[in-house]
Each structure stands twice: as structure tokens, then as C-alpha cells.
């Protein structure tokens, strides 16, 4: 475990034989907003992955903003990274097959922070992160009026109050699937 201090924030890093993880830690006092977070997972475009797309109507406008409200339920698609549908968001966890290794990408410790979606905007081997902006207006709706439906969003992803730690970004590494558990 290592912590790299940058003053107002630090990065905690962990590396083990079975994987790696990192998270940001804020030392800021008072209220502040997180505008965005950037992470990229780079692989060969020919590497294959098991990915769960967000449910998406093929006739809908290819807009990530409409895909942030999801049930996080879908079957996994096995595809080369270069063939990932750039119009669709992917939710974690995913498994990337690289050479003789399997890499499980996920997150943990989500509290008052949006979940991480992945995309392949450029049709290459880079998986980009996407985060839903914080809801501004939420109205009751959906099936049997049981859901909070986001009607508008802020231009930032999180509101924070004082020092805190942020979600872990995790990559587990194994040769066979059972080693990823």
C-alpha cells in the first residue's frame, strides 16, 4: 500500500499478486464539487472482453445521458474491444481477456458518488470512464410510480462536504475465471 500526497488530495494505491486498486482521498475542508473523473483502461483493440451493455433501444439517439438511468441488468456480450458499440455504455464489472490473463475491472466503496460506466468512444482498445452528472430535478415516475426519474442534471458529478475517500477502482488479475473471485 502506498499513499501519494498532493496537498489537498492524495492517491492511495494497492498492488497484490491478484490485482491492483487505487482511490482518491480528499483533504479539503468545507463544501466542494467534483466536476468529472477520468480513467482510461488501455488494451489492444483485438483483446476480447465480456461486457454488459446498458439496455438501449437501437432506434434511440446515441446519447450517453439517456443511458445513465438503468436497471444494471443485461446478459454479457463477448466481443473484441474494437467491436464494442461506441453508442452504448457498459456497466461494471467487465472481464478483459489479454494474452493468457483475465482482467476484472470494477469498483467498490460507492457512497454519495456516481457509479462508473465504461465506453469505447474511438473504437480502439481504450475503455474510457463515464459518470452520470448529479441529478438536479427528480420526479416520481416509472413503473407503478415507484422510481425517481431524473428530469435534469447538474454540470458536475458529485457534491462533497469535507475530507473523504472516493470509490476504489479495481483490476483483479487471474489466469482462469475462478481466480478473479
Predicted regions and their residues:
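N-terminal accessory beta-strand-rich subdomains and adjacent acidic, glycine-rich linkers
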Residues: 1-181
